[in-house]
């Protein structure tokens, strides 16, 4: 049977990008995820020259706010992501013309998520106790994009002192060598290897191996012969207060709890 074309939902951080995709793309765009800088994982960099605050995190300003009214004029559905994990945020998104919200952080820490159960429990405990904080690290990711790191006071996680080895390579980028061949390099691989492939040594500073860390998050850390297992590195959106609000005095919660929490102000009880 003929395959059904999947919907193409583009992730954007500006109305200008959305309009360009909708009008000039050589294929159909079915909608947009509008991701703000409060979202977990990778973030779009701030518009303009990169500026850092006193903690070393990128500074976002008015230019980074998406013009949702202009986006709505395209007539395509859109979902708001980044700081949208609350009943109030869902209600506000719908009022602004959004089809809904995209939520990551609340589901990441629910019982059904793939994060290692012990790591998840420890993280929730620190979030509830107020010893966790989210840092937007402009250097951690080899992609060059800012990456949200959930810093935990009592949980050992990967840092940039890790002995470098690149044996998964999911974030490698292609480059053309002097001989015309295509090769692959990663700014988090051993520095001498990266430089030998024509990379700028400045690009290696502060990088972490997200590939190994994120696999370790799932409880499947690599352990090479004679070495300790790879350490995890959790990511989270900025809004830890909503996680605290949902978990309350419990030690965990389900995906169903998340859905009911998010829809509390918009769906009448059965």
Q: What positions do the PLM features span?
A:
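Conserved alpha/beta-domain cores
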Residues: 1-47, 54-58
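Conserved active-site-proximal phosphate/metal-binding subdomains
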Residues: 29, 37-77, 85, 95-270
């Amino acid at each position: 049977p003929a395959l059904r074309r999947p919907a193409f939902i583009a992730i954007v951080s500006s109305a200008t990008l959305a309009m360009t995709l909708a009008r000039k793309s050589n294929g159909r765009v079915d909608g947009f995820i509008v991701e703000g800088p409060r979202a977990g994982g990778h973030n779009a960099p701030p518009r303009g020259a990169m500026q850092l605050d006193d903690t070393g995190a990128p500074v976002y300003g008015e230019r980074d706010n998406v013009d949702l009214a202009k986006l709505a004029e395209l007539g395509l559905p859109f979902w708001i992501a980044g700081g949208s994990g609350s009943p109030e945020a869902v209600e506000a998104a719908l009022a602004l013309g959004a089809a809904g919200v995209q939520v990551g952080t609340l589901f990441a820490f629910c019982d059904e998520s793939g994060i290692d159960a012990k790591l998840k429990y420890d993280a929730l405990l620190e979030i509830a106790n107020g010893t966790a904080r989210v840092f937007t690290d402009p250097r951690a990711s080899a992609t060059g994009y800012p990456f949200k790191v959930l810093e935990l006071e009592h949980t050992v996680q990967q840092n940039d002192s890790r002995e470098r080895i690149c044996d998964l390579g999911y974030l490698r980028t292609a480059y053309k060598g002097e001989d015309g061949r295509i090769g692959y390099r990663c700014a988090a691989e051993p520095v001498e290897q990266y430089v030998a492939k024509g990379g700028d040594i400045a690009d290696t500073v502060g990088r972490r191996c997200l590939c190994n860390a994120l696999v370790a998050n799932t409880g499947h850390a690599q352990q090479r012969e004679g070495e300790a297992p790879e350490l995890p590195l959790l990511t989270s959106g900025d809004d830890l207060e909503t996680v605290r609000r949902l978990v309350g005095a419990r030690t965990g919660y389900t995906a169903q709890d998340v859905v009911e929490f998010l829809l509390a102000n918009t769906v009448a009880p059965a």
